Amino acid sequence: LKKRGLLLHKVGHGWTGEVLGYETVSWDQNLSPLAPEKQAMAAEIAGKRELWQGSPANTNLCFHCGDAVDSFADLVVEYAKSNPAVDYLHVWLADEYNNVCECEGCRQTTPSDQYVSLLNEIDRRLTAEKLSTRIVFLLYQELLWPPIREKLENPDRFVLMFAPISRTFEASYDFSGSEVPIPAFERNHIVLPTNLQENLAFLRGWQKLFHGDSFVYDYPLGRAHYGDFGYVHIARVISSDIKQLHKMGLDGYISCQELRVTFPNALPNYVMGYTLFDESADPQALIQEYFTAAYGERAEQ
């Protein structure tokens, strides 16, 4: 990677499960109950502190609990120390929503405020260890709502990652309409936005608070492609999305996708790669070029 001038991104989800004492490399259920000394670190939901549907990766923490914050920050710093080749370390929370802590302490603030406070603590510890690892923070589910009070104390440490997992792929981002407001946050009763204007509203809310490096982590080939049998429509959406990154105030694009998205063809990734390299690339020309190479005389069929 280094010889080729590439930057290494690592981790993502899984930290919360590790804090709770589980080796967390998947979303699988774990039948082992929480250890008594870990129970206070788990999110309290409906009066109970336990694994969310049995999955450590999907279980949130109680960030009012100092031990949870301390353990989380220590894990991140130890990982950074042990993996100096990592350029961008992704620090995400649980991979589920409507399952954040309901304890009295957590109710006094918001998940995003607690998240930013955690990120600041991680930054202080990385700085103390003289580690330059960049931290990628996540706009996703509850964390789409911007913080109310907290702000990142050392913005140069951080990279914003916008992850609109619930967006529609029927169309690309649209800037023609008027801006819409961010809906009120209701703890454990949020509805994820499918509307593109609403997704952009969340991004703009964070961009008012953070002006550093940023990119989108998007999902066109996660499952939306299943409804597009020839992959032509989704390839056009990908092209349009990439061409609008700068208008969205974003600096790059990561595709959260299945690896085997080549049936009946690999057109979407072909268009994605070329358009990221050259935003002026004509999607129709790329489609024609790909189909001619793949299907020869039958390209027009």
Indicate residue ranges for each PLM-predicted region.
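Extended ligand-binding regions for polar small-molecule ligands
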Residues: 296
